[in-house]
C-alpha cells in the first residue's frame, strides 16, 4: 500500500487540539479520499496519521482547533462517516513530527480474514457503566493492547495477554480455553478500535456475551472522576506526549528512542539509561556497536535542536 507524507515545519509553541478517531464502515472508495484528506490537513496545519482501508478509517491528528475541526467536518460530510465519533484532548506542543495519510489493508491489523465489525460486533458499554461490569465476578476483563502499553497502566483485575502486536491476539485467545469459564467477556483498548475488532473475532469464536468499552480508556479517563476510577497507572498514547492520565492531562512518561518503550522519570536515574541510547528494558539486548550508532544519532538530534529544527530520525 502507499502513503503520503510531509516533512515537518519548525515547531510552534502553543496549545494544540488532539483528536483520536476511528470508524468501521464499508468504504470501497477509500483510495480516492487520500489526496483530499492530505491536502486538507496540510492547508489547516494539521499533523498526525490517518489510515484508510476498505473497512473504514483510523488515526490521530493534532493542530489548531479550527484546523482539526475542519478535518472532522470533512470526514462527517462523507456518507460512510456521518456517525464518526472522536475523542479530544490537549497538548502543550505539537505532538506529531509529520503528516501521514496511508492506504492499508486493515485500519487495525489483526490478520484474520473475514473478521468484519460492520457485520458482527460486541456490545458497547459506556464509561460510566464500565466499573459495574468489570467488578462483576462473572466477567473476565481483557486488555487488547500490546505489552509496552500495559506496562504503564491497566484496569484493576484485567488479564494482560502480553502480546507484542495485535496480530498475536487471535492465537492467544485460541490457546486460552479457560476464557470460556465465565459467561461475560469485557475488553478494552486505548480508543476503542482494537477491542471493537477483537469483539468481532470473539463472537466468531463462539463467545456469546462480549462487551467493549465505548471510546476506550481515553473516554473513561475523560468522563470518570479519579476518585471513582478503577484505572491504575497511565495510558500510553501514540504521539509525543507518550502518556495521559485522568482528565487526559499529559503524563510524565517519555520514550526510550532506542527501543520505543515508555519510561518513567525514575528509570532515567538507572545507570542503564542513556538519552537516546538505552534504558533498562533494552540495555542488555544491544551491542556496543548498536549503542554507538544510537549515540551518533542522538548527537544529530541535539545539533538539530540547537538550530531550532526537528530531527526526522527521532
UniProtKB/Swiss-Prot annotation:
<dbReference type="InterPro" id="IPR020936">
    <property type="entry name" value="TrhO"/>
</dbReference>
<dbReference type="InterPro" id="IPR036873">
    <property type="entry name" value="Rhodanese-like_dom_sf"/>
</dbReference>
<comment type="function">
    <text>Catalyzes oxygen-dependent 5-hydroxyuridine (ho5U) modification at position 34 in tRNAs.</text>
</comment>
<feature type="active site" description="Cysteine persulfide intermediate">
    <location>
        <position position="189"/>
    </location>
</feature>
<dbReference type="GO" id="GO:0006400">
    <property type="term" value="P:tRNA modification"/>
</dbReference>
<dbReference type="Pfam" id="PF17773">
    <property type="entry name" value="UPF0176_N"/>
</dbReference>
<dbReference type="InterPro" id="IPR040503">
    <property type="entry name" value="TRHO_N"/>
</dbReference>
<comment type="similarity">
    <text>Belongs to the TrhO family.</text>
</comment>
<dbReference type="Pfam" id="PF00581">
    <property type="entry name" value="Rhodanese"/>
</dbReference>
<feature type="domain" description="Rhodanese">
    <location>
        <begin position="135"/>
        <end position="229"/>
    </location>
</feature>
<protein>
    <recommendedName>
        <fullName>tRNA uridine(34) hydroxylase</fullName>
        <ecNumber>1.14.-.-</ecNumber>
    </recommendedName>
</protein>
<keyword id="KW-0560">Oxidoreductase</keyword>
<dbReference type="InterPro" id="IPR001763">
    <property type="entry name" value="Rhodanese-like_dom"/>
</dbReference>
<keyword id="KW-0819">tRNA processing</keyword>
<dbReference type="GO" id="GO:0016705">
    <property type="term" value="F:oxidoreductase activity, acting on paired donors, with incorporation or reduction of molecular oxygen"/>
</dbReference>
Amino acid at each position: 500500500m502507499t502513503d503520503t507524507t510531509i516533512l515537518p515545519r519548525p515547531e510552534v509553541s502553543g496549545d494544540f487540539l488532539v483528536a483520536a478517531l476511528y470508524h468501521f464502515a464499508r468504504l470501497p472508495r477509500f483510495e480516492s479520499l487520500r489526496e483530499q484528506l492530505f491536502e486538507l490537513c496540510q492547508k489547516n496545519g494539521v499533523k498526525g496519521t490517518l489510515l484508510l482501508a476498505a473497512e473504514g478509517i483510523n488515526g490521530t491528528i493534532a493542530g489548531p482547533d479550527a484546523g482539526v475541526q475542519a478535518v472532522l467536518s470533512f470526514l462527517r460530510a462523507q456518507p460512510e462517516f456521518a456517525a464518526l465519533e472522536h475523542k479530544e484532548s490537549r497538548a502543550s506542543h505539537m505532538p506529531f513530527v509529520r503528516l501521514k495519510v496511508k492506504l492499508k489493508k486493515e485500519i487495525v491489523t489483526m490478520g484474520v480474514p473475514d473478521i468484519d465489525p460492520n457485520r458482527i460486533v460486541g456490545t458497547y458499554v459506556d464509561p460510566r457503566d464500565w466499573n459495574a461490569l468489570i467488578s462483576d465476578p462473572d466477567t473476565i476483563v481483557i486488555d487488547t493492547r500490546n505489552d509496552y502499553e500495559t506496562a504503564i497502566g491497566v484496569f484493576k483485575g484485567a488479564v494482560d495477554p502480553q502480546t507484542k502486536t495485535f496480530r498475536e491476539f487471535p492465537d492467544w485467545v485460541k490457546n486460552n480455553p479457560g476464557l470460556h469459564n465465565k459467561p461475560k467477556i469485557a475488553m478494552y483498548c486505548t480508543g476503542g478500535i482494537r477491542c471493537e475488532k477483537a469483539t468481532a473475532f470473539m463472537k466468531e469464536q463462539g463467545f456469546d456475551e462480549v462487551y467493549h468499552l465505548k471510546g476506550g480508556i481515553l473516554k473513561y479517563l475523560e468522563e470518570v472522576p479519579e476518585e471513582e476510577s478503577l484505572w491504575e497507572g497511565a495510558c500510553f498514547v501514540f504521539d509525543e506526549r507518550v502518556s495521559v492520565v485522568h482528565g487526559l492531562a499529559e503524563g510524565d512518561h517519555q520514550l526510550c528512542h532506542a527501543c520505543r518503550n515508555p519510561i518513567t522519570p525514575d528509570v532515567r536515574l538507572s545507570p542503564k539509561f542513556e538519552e537516546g541510547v538505552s534504558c533498562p528494558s533494552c540495555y542488555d539486548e544491544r551491542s556496543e556497536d548498536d549503542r554507538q550508532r544510537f549515540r551518533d544519532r542522538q548527537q544529530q538530534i541535539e545539533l538539530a535542536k540547537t538550530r531550532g529544527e526537528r530531527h526526522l530520525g527521532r
